[in-house]
């Protein structure tokens, strides 16, 4: 899930309002998908001090408002198990296209540069998110670049194309 509304940031909400929006988002997700979401990313990656507790309380298994590591880990908290699936911004249509005004092809070009140069970082494993938003790349030009990016990743032997949920299952004991 990615919150009920993108213009409401948990970091600016009180606990009751954040929980009400979270529940509204869960119910909306259930209405469309027939099940509750397993994970959550706040709009703009802006959790509040209460977000982790609320996510555990409402049955979430993973949270991606984390930018501090390259691989999933369990969040150290007193409320229960919740996996952090770190989020990356390098290949994200919002900043690349909207904020910095790049042409759509920058999306694929940056991904290919990361994939080509990854071995030089001497990092054994890392997450690289391909992030597209319906209101940004949800047009033919965006679909073209997303397809090209997926094809570029599929050509690599050292790339696992997966979901945040699958990454969370690596570290979450009750998934």
Model-derived features: positions:
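Catalytic alpha-helical scaffold of carbohydrate-active enzymes acting on polysaccharides/glycoconjugates
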Residues: 1-39, 44-83, 107-130, 136-175
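A structural motif
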Residues: 77-95
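Binuclear metal-dependent hydrolase catalytic cores centered on His/Asp/Glu-rich metal-binding motifs
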Residues: 89-110, 114
């Amino acid at each position: 899930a990615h919150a009920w509304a993108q213009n409401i940031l948990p970091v600016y909400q009180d606990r009751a309002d954040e929980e009400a929006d979270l529940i509204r988002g869960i119910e909306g997700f259930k209405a469309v998908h027939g099940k509750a979401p397993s994970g959550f990313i706040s709009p703009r990656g802006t959790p509040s001090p209460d977000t982790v507790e609320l996510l555990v309380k409402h049955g979430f298994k993973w949270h991606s408002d984390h930018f501090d590591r390259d691989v999933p880990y369990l969040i150290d908290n007193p409320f229960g198990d919740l996996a952090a699936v770190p989020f990356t911004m390098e290949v994200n249509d919002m900043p690349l296209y909207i904020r910095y005004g790049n042409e759509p092809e920058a999306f694929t070009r940056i991904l290919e540069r990361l994939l080509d140069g990854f071995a030089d970082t001497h990092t054994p494993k890392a997450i690289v998110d391909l992030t597209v938003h319906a209101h940004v790349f949800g047009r033919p030009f965006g679909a073209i670049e997303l397809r090209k990016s997926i094809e570029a990743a599929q050509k690599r032997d050292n790339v696992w194309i997966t979901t945040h949920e699958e990454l969370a299952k690596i570290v979450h004991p009750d998934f």
